[in-house]
């Protein structure tokens, strides 16, 4: 039987509400422009250990998607900016993309969203006219695969498409983009999807020339004389983050669209910058992300939409040290490329307290590494690198098996554990790799291991090298949690509507 139009619209509205009615979550963006990118399996192990349940990928990397299989972690995949033109012009290209990058992995991998491009209007404006077509073609391909209710489609937008975001109540989208934005919003409304927004208070603060105080950008409490108030609505804004999200809601209302949920697909704060980037500090980054997590997980929306939580993805998991541009561009991550924490980051109210430190990441020899190169690396680690190699001497707990890969792994790891917080890497001329799997065995405990049954012998731990200059980051903790949704009332509403419809037939 065909459902009447009113019921179809109610169903779409309910599905849209369901998509964002869960208790708010904090996710992370995973960029890959870094040296010594950890293997996907190790990244997933790390995410699971910290109870991170939502991630955004900037493409649809097959190795990453396979690693996320059977984890329940919700994955947002990306159509790259370079792929949009072809997908927008050819429905067959969209179908092929969905079949290859989404349908092939579901249900094992929990793909729940597709981000079509990133900041398309402001970075590749010549593609803007075809963006709506690309969105529709991807959605039609999902419909054909019966995945349109599970996987939502949208396109992340920059704050730059709103020229004057303050006061939020008067914010509008740039008139030059009204046609494209209107098409986007109509698509989001029709498909029950959400508006993806990249909102960076760091840039809002640094480009405002002192108009707004730093504390406002960092979620810090302002004194009564510095309170930020919208003069038109008299709504108080305790953070620039909330004002940015509300600016998006008001901009949508200006085009007669309401209740399309905003999901912040990128936000964060750089931990280091150049001489002209004074606000990019470890202290500010730690403060921003710590307060951001608390803000998002209080499960409320911005002042104009208090009942719509702000699901948010932190930018980003790793410092992408290969990125070009200002120093800050390479320092948005909460982890260094070698896996150590940039600063302590914790989430109050979570049940996990697992440490993100040396005990969760080890450095070992690659299985296919050349033995001659391993010998060179082993000699360097135990010599100039000043690793503690006493445990791999004859008669000691880690001497057997007596082969170069085993000995090199122990030496590489000891050096790595001691020096990573000071910038030491796990490379050794391409012969080493990081892993979250503890390589300890029998009575041989690798440095950083929590294996109480193994021992590295009763000898001075610094027999062949000094203690590592580990700083406060060595025991830094990052804790993420996820509150389970309470969907029963909404599900009941849907059921009641369906029963009423049946009785009318």
From Swiss-Prot:
Report the EC code(s) recorded for this entry.
Answer: 3.2.1.39
| Keyword Transport assigned | no
Molecular function (GO) terms for this protein are: glucan endo-1,3-beta-D-glucosidase activity
Concerning SMART domains, the annotation shows:
X8 (SM00768)
Q: Which domain of life is it from?
A: Eukaryota
Propiece residue ranges? 475-505
Q: Membrane topology type, per the record?
A: Lipid-anchor; GPI-anchor
UniProt modification remark: Contains two additional disulfide bonds.
Would you tell me the Gene Ontology cellular component terms?
cytosol; plasma membrane; side of membrane
Q: List the disulfide bonds.
A: 363-426
Subcellular location as annotated:
Cell membrane
- Which residues are covalently lipidated (GPI-anchor amidated alanine)? 474
Q: Which InterPro entries match?
A: Glyco_hydro_17, Glyco_hydro_17_plant, Glycoside_hydrolase_SF, X8
The residues forming the signal peptide are 1-23
Q: Name one GO biological process term.
A: carbohydrate metabolic process
- Indicate the enzyme's highest-level EC class: hydrolase
User: Catalysed reaction(s)?
Assistant: Hydrolysis of (1->3)-beta-D-glucosidic linkages in (1->3)-beta-D-glucans
Q: Which residues are glycosylated?
A: 70, 110, 178, 256, 298, 338, 357, 453
Residues of the active site: 119 (proton donor), 266 (nucleophile)
**Protein family membership:** Belongs to the glycosyl hydrolase 17 family.
Q: What's the protein name?
A: Glucan endo-1,3-beta-glucosidase 4
